[in-house]
Amino acid sequence: MLKKTLLGLTAGALLLNASSALAANYKIDIPGQHAFIGFRIQHLGYSWLYGTFKDFDGSFTFDEQNPAENKVNVTIKIASLDTNHAERDKHLRSKDYFNTEKYPEAKFTSTEVKKEGEKYVVTGDLTLNGVTKPVILNAELMGEGKDPWGGYRAGFEASGKIKLKDFNFKADLGPKSQEADLLISIEGVREK
């Protein structure tokens, strides 16, 4: 009886370890520019203003069969902000908005990943402008597989919202400009 119990426990431990082994680590493909982190916000309620961050780095762990093992970590250099207008970008880097002299980086670290149907709900801590708050991103696996260079890739699209007042933005552009939409598209190369 003791032998059967020990064998059962050993087999169970091996199965648990095997499912954890399916989780793969990916580096976001920044060198190949197969990644985008941006935002949009209403400008005075009349139009959408789009911006992007050109300098960021990160990684993720992905296991389609065990979403609880999935993790995301991203660091953004806020001064790399680009809205296609140099004067506006300078103003957005100021104390009224991102305050890049005092807070040069933003960081997102996931705390939980859940699969809901074909999509993923990624909850994490966003540190921006000296404040850390939970943020929810809705993500979708765009695809995964071997690439022509001998690697293996996985790509995701994600979106979410943040309230500007939650992150100490000082300027107020009216009631329709209180939230920003986050727009993310990343492709990761599996680490060997």
From Swiss-Prot:
Its main location: periplasm. It comes from Photorhabdus laumondii subsp. laumondii (strain DSM 15139 / CIP 105565 / TT01). It holds the Pfam family YceI. PANTHER family: PROTEIN YCEI. Gene3D superfamilies: Lipid/polyisoprenoid-binding, YceI-like. The keyword Signal applies. It is found in: Periplasm. NCBIfam families: PRK03757.1. One of its GO terms (cellular component) is periplasmic space. InterPro entries: Lipid/polyisoprenoid-bd_YceI (IPR007372), TTHA0802/YceI-like_sf (IPR036761), UPF0312/YceI (IPR023480). This is UPF0312 protein plu2095. Residues 1-23 form the signal peptide. Belongs to the UPF0312 family. Type 1 subfamily. Keywords: Periplasm, Signal.
